[in-house]
Amino acid sequence: MAVDSIIDYILTDHAVGELRRRGIRQQEIEGILKNPGQRLDLRPGRVVLQSKFQEGETEYLLRVIVDIDRSPAEVVTAYRTSKVAKYWREQV
């Protein structure tokens, strides 16, 4: 699976509010967009870019949902989750 970076993007109003509410910094989003650990297609025109990270002894994912069928791409929302096994797709 090719992992593409996204350089040119905007944050939707919804994304701005959710990032603030969830305590996620825009720099974290930019890091995932530039160098995602994994890209999954959700539906035509929408992808999730995600990367694993460690906090203490717990492994998490930061997932960024992006509409790529427009220019610039639009970050719809982002969130952290400890449910790595549910969302991470191992390469076979």
Language-model segments: what does each one mean?
Residues 1-92:
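Ribonuclease/tRNase effector modules and their secretory precursors
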